[in-house]
Amino acid sequence: MRKKSLIWTIIMLIGLSSIVCAYLFSQSLKAEADQNEDKKTKFSLSVATSKDVEVLDYSNIGINAYQDIFNTAKQAQIAQLIAAKKAAGHYKFPQILALSNPYLTNTTSVYIYFETEKVSKVSYQISAAGYPDFVGEANSSENEYETTHEFQAIGFVAGVKNTITLTVTDKEGNETTKTLTYTPPKLVSKDKNTLEVTDGTSEKALTSGLYTVFGDKNVSQRATYLVDNDGIIRGEYPILSYNSMRFVFDEQSMYYGISAEKIARINQLGQVEQVYDVGSAGYNLHHDFTLDKEGNLLALATSEEAEEKDNLVEDRIVQINTKTGKVKQIADFKALLPDLYQLATGIETITSYAGKWDPIHLNTIQYVEDGSIIVSSRETSTIMKLSNIEDALSIDYFISDESVWKGVGNYSNFVLEKESDFVSQLGQHSVTYVEDATLEEGQYYLYMFNNNSKIMDSRTNFDWSAYPDSFSDQSTDGDYSRYSKYLVDENKGTYELVDSLEVPYSAFVSSVQEMGDNLLVNPGLQGIFTEYDKNHQVIRTYQLSGNGVTSYRVYKYDFKGFYFK
């Protein structure tokens, strides 16, 4: 699977297809976002085979469509089935209860339950012929050692025979093992279990964790999937439409998008415990969401009423109470920036909202512990910090080139000053807020995928002269995007470019993620993601499978405290 070559050779070959990918990606996103949420997508239970791992009988529950998987009442019925099996058996290790993906939320996973005489911890190793081994330390409680062990094992290779070896270790270090065999179902989204891997010039180690691919459009069934460092798909979460945007963790819960209207919350065993529906409140989700300090979801949204009345899209933020499910709008950028809306009247022509009015196009939201939020506006190439989100929303600052806001009301007063001479971000995505204990109070970092794409359909007469060496949606050989990192100093009202890297060009979507000393970059329209070392040398690049393949984001999670200790 690995091929030694220079990574830029691949980049040159696939760069020419970016314009086609951009068009297909944007049009398919729009079509999918417009799908009727009530349309039933037929569900067929995939075949798993094993004498050691049981498949539940769902005939009395009625799982007939993927929508049924995200029905919390049906999920509760599944939990009752599992509880009945636990009560009916005597599962003292080495006797165990093993179920194939009982909650139907992770295609290749296995639910495992047993008890031990002594307090113990559990680790496991998964082996499959022709694939590297996968290891994990099971997380069944907050304690390191327990007598009751209930967890979801992930890391199985789809459609082939896997051997899982469970190792139970007591406090004295005594080990007992049990081996099971299991052939999981095939993936519902991809034909292949592997991604093509190309090693770069760096010999540095990759970070631990699983790459999580969001919004791969070249799939037979929409899903978010996990990829290990060797390019093996180790997990798959089927969804209804759109993409999952990101995984957000809170105690023993994980949140992810399942459609353009819904976010699901699952527990460590894979059970869907709640589904939050903004569609019933008159909104659609897009791009991103996060949690605030009270445990509420903050999500970027489109008002269905504003879209129907004014063709206006992607300029709202809603708060979702995770206890009650109540949806409340906390930001309307037309009300916040009326002078911009009077000026930026052009209609989208090439993106997923062609024919719509999209003067802000929010694509990232980050929550700051002081109660403020940082959002990214692609259309204005501006990063905005906003305060008083619960009351009267107010602007703290903008980060952009001053030319963006020159002559637009008094908004130029909010633009921070550049600390040195550099070109500001353009069409950015995946903006991330980072605190650092070595910095003074009022200082922090912001890093982003700087698309370097000059696209602003809402203001077709905009002067781009402040952005030399920038590119349009018409990708050509030699175009590039950037990873950009700023030091923001609110005390001085400045921002400074402290790190930058030229990366393969992507006019839209895309993500970056700092992981210790390493950097993960996903130029979405290129269909690749790459991990770099601290010197910005390529360690390894992964190519998504399929023709014209694109992705929305790729982040890497270690799943510690959720699946693993």
Region locations from a protein language model:
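Ser/Thr/Pro/Gly-rich low-complexity linker/stalk segments immediately outside membranes or between
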Residues: 27-44
